[in-house]
C-alpha cells in the first residue's frame, strides 16, 4: 500500500473522530458518558487555541469545523499525490466542505439505524454507545414521535 494513501486514510479517520466531537457538542451529549468524556479530554486541547478567533456559535464549534475541513483538505492532497493527479486548491477546499456535510449526514443516518435497532434489541440497555446514538437522534425523531401509535411501528 502506498504510504501517501495510508496517510490519506488516517487523516480521514481523524476527520471522522472530530465529526463525532462536533456532534457531541452540538447535541449536548452528557459528559458523564465515558465515550464523550474521552473524546472531550483528547480533542478539546486541539480545538481550544482556535476558539480565540473561531468561537462556538449556536452550538456549532467552528474550531472543530476548521479542523475537519483542514483534515479533509490534507486527505485530498495526500490522495491526489498518491494517484499522481493534478491538485487544485479551490476544488480541494470545496470538496472538503462538501465531504464535511456528507460525513455528518452519514453519521446521523447510521446513528438513526443503530438507535432503531437498539430500541428493538435492547430497549433498557445502559450501553454508552447506544446512549450516544439515542441522544443524537432524539431531536431528529421528536416530531415523528408525537404522531399517534401505528400499532407496533416504532418511531
Regions found by a protein language model. Give the residues of each.
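Selective transmembrane helix interface/packing segments
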Residues: 1-155
Amino acid at each position: 500500500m502506498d504510504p501517501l494513501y495510508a496517510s490519506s486514510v488516517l487523516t480521514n479517520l481523524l476527520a471522522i473522530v472530530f465529526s463525532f466531537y462536533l456532534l457531541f457538542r452540538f447535541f449536548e451529549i452528557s459528559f458523564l458518558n465515558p465515550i464523550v468524556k474521552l473524546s472531550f479530554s483528547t480533542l478539546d486541547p486541539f480545538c481550544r487555541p482556535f476558539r480565540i478567533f473561531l468561537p462556538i456559535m449556536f452550538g456549532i464549534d467552528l474550531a472543530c469545523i476548521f479542523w475537519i475541513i483542514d483534515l479533509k483538505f490534507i486527505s485530498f492532497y495526500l490522495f491526489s499525490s498518491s494517484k499522481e493527479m493534478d491538485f487544485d486548491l479551490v476544488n480541494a477546499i470545496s470538496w472538503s466542505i462538501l465531504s464535511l456535510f456528507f460525513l455528518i449526514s452519514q453519521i446521523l443516518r447510521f446513528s438513526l439505524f443503530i438507535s432503531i435497532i437498539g430500541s428493538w434489541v435492547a430497549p433498557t440497555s445502559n450501553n454508552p454507545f447506544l446512549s450516544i446514538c439515542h441522544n443524537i437522534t432524539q431531536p431528529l425523531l421528536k416530531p415523528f414521535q408525537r404522531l399517534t401509535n401505528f400499532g407496533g411501528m416504532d418511531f
